[in-house]
Regions:
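Glycine/proline-rich, positively charged
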Residues: 1-49, 53-54, 58, 62, ...
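Structured C-terminal cap/extension of enzyme domains
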Residues: 42-47, 61-160
Length: 160
């Protein structure tokens, strides 16, 4: 979020010239959310990219709904909370009720929470090994959690 006016002007010129297709902004820092939100309200953007995870839901309170209301695509980075979520559940079994939304791993549990948000377009998880790619793709298969199940997932992760 540095010199946003100049950067967005440049990006719009590039879009108009056909050099890029989409214009958006990104942040991974809660302390920038206020300025980020103001930019979202003031500017016409194609997308935003923000950090959002089952244990870090701040962007889901204001930024993600605002993007949905304004017709902006929403890309989620850090859906595993910089590894915090895996650390929190290390040695724990997946809840039995995770089968209700076709979930067979913790990575899928975390990603299905993210992509089931009605305003989220996609998640961008980091993957260090090929088997992680396969597992993460499993989150795109089968049922997604509904609103009540999403709340249950939040309560579960808040309790660990």
């Amino acid at each position: 979020l540095r010199d946003t006016d100049t950067q967005l002007r440049t990006l719009r010129e590039m879009k108009q010239a056909g050099r890029i297709r989409y214009v958006g902004i990104t942040t991974s820092f809660d302390k920038q959310y206020g300025e980020f939100e103001q930019t979202m309200k003031k500017e016409t953007l194609d997308f935003i990219q923000v950090d959002y995870a089952l244990d870090n839901r701040d962007a889901g309170d204001r930024l993600i709904p605002l993007a949905g209301d304004r017709g902006m695509a929403v890309m989620i980075n850090l859906p595993f909370g910089r590894g915090r979520l895996f650390n929190a559940v290390q040695g724990k079994k997946l809840p039995e009720w995770a089968t209700e939304f076709d979930c067979v791993s913790w990575a899928q549990f975390f990603l299905k929470y993210i992509v089931s948000h009605p305003a989220v377009t996609c998640a961008v998880p980091g993957m260090a090994r090929p088997e992680y790619v396969s597992d993460n793709l499993g989150a795109a298969r089968g049922r997604l959690p509904d609103a009540a199940t999403r709340k249950r997932m939040e309560q579960f992760i808040d309790s660990v």
